[in-house]
């Protein structure tokens, strides 16, 4: 009944991943991002992560697997997803939705910390403002984007972009793979400490 649809969806997902893998710059960007994060942790820094919708879930997933565990038991790493509902509703109400992440970065971000901003379009105003706040604090910035990078293109120390122009879910599927690989590489880097 739906076998063709299922095959088409899985084939499109595989094709999106294959296209991402073709560009060697993506492999290097993932490695640079992992080393940047591990270096921050080794120096006493932390990572703040943010995004909207499914990207917000990815930001929380990233922080959870750093503070908790991924595949192996190891010490937790300092990671905070900007996901506190009371903060988001307060700032959204009092300052506007575009400020929900930047206010948090202004409050707890420090020089030497890292911001991971996730946006499939690269045009999320609240993530862009968080990047600006992170820069003002002397933080490093990593972005996970899609399509042409949108307004976030060129704003990060490391941008990992999925150049897919279809639905956002295909971009998110690559983002979660990248997040898992980042955690794996961070764990390897932290053992070197």
Swiss-Prot record:
Assembly, per entry: Homotetramer.
Enzyme class: isomerase
Reported function: Catalyzes the isomerization of sedoheptulose 7-phosphate in D-glycero-D-manno-heptose 7-phosphate.
Similarity section: Belongs to the SIS family. GmhA subfamily.
Domain SIS: 37-193
Cofactor: Zn(2+)
Binding site for substrate: 52-54, 65, 93-94, 119-121, 124, 172
Gene: gmhA
Protein keywords: Carbohydrate metabolism, Cytoplasm, Isomerase, Metal-binding, Zinc
Record-listed Zn(2+) binding positions: 61, 65, 172, 180
Organism annotation: Cronobacter sakazakii (strain ATCC BAA-894) (Enterobacter sakazakii)
Remarks, miscellaneous: The reaction produces a racemic mixture of D-glycero-alpha-D-manno-heptose 7-phosphate and D-glycero-beta-D-manno-heptose 7-phosphate.
GO cellular component terms listed in the entry, alphabetical order: cytoplasm
Annotated metabolic or biological route of this protein: Carbohydrate biosynthesis; D-glycero-D-manno-heptose 7-phosphate biosynthesis; D-glycero-alpha-D-manno-heptose 7-phosphate and D-glycero-beta-D-manno-heptose 7-phosphate from sedoheptulose 7-phosphate: step 1/1
GO molecular function: carbohydrate derivative binding; D-sedoheptulose 7-phosphate isomerase activity; zinc ion binding
Protein's name in the database: Phosphoheptose isomerase
